[in-house]
């Protein structure tokens, strides 16, 4: 399942080697032919271990990082960080040292950094793995929010119970093969 997310966000074959058969299309364009900056503008990824995607020590800088890379004006950075914190209700995590956060709080900041960039596609790899029950409920609300915004969401996940009312389709994989595609009702 992680391999699929790495294909969609362009990490395979650009950063992870292997034999690639077939094509991965996003908006009708083959991912392997697009430069990473174009993919990153369209596809936002939240990895299972959020520490692997952090580039800053404090939470506000981390949330702003992707926007800064788009060379946005400073005032827009400030506004987007504030709007993200408001939309996701994570004000209590602002201006904190990332190394002092719990695993679940780090996951929330990783999600917020992607949300601030406003991608069309969200890729989440095991987003509930570091979360307690309350945080899983918050994650569900965040997913409901981005779905309402018309975003595409692809989630690689073992825990499905919290996604059943949100999912349009569930793709069941076993040993790297698609064994079935279901609606939540069929699953």
Say what each PLM segment does.
Residues 23-38:
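ABC ATPase NBD Q-loop/coupling interface
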Residues 75-93:
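Conserved ABC ATPase "signature" region
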Residues 97-101, 105:
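Conserved ABC ATPase signature
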Residues 111-112:
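Hydrophobic anchor residue at the start of the ABC signature
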Residues 122-125:
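Catalytic Walker B motif of ABC-type/P-loop ATPase nucleotide-binding domains
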Residues 157-158:
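H-loop/switch region of ABC-family ATPase nucleotide-binding domains
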């Amino acid at each position: 399942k992680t391999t699929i997310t790495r294909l969609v966000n362009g990490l395979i074959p650009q950063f992870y080697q292997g034999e690639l058969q077939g094509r991965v299309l996003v908006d009708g364009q083959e991912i392997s032919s697009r430069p990473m900056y174009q993919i990153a503008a369209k596809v936002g990824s939240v990895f299972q271990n959020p520490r692997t995607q952090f580039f800053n020590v404090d939470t506000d800088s981390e949330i702003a990082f992707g926007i800064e890379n788009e060379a946005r004006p400073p005032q827009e950075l400030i506004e987007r960080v504030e709007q993200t914190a408001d939309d996701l209700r994570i004000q209590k995590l602002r201006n904190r040292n990332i190394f002092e956060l719990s695993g679940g709080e780090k996951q929330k900041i990783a999600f917020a950094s992607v949300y601030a960039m406003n991608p069309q596609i969200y890729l989440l790899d095991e987003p509930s793995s570091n979360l307690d029950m309350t945080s899983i409920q918050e994650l569900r609300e965040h997913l409901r929010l981005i779905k309402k915004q018309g975003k595409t969401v692809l989630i690689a996940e073992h825990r499905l119970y919290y996604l059943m009312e949100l999912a349009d389709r569930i793709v069941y994989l076993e040993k790297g093969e698609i064994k079935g595609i279901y609606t939540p009702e069929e699953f």
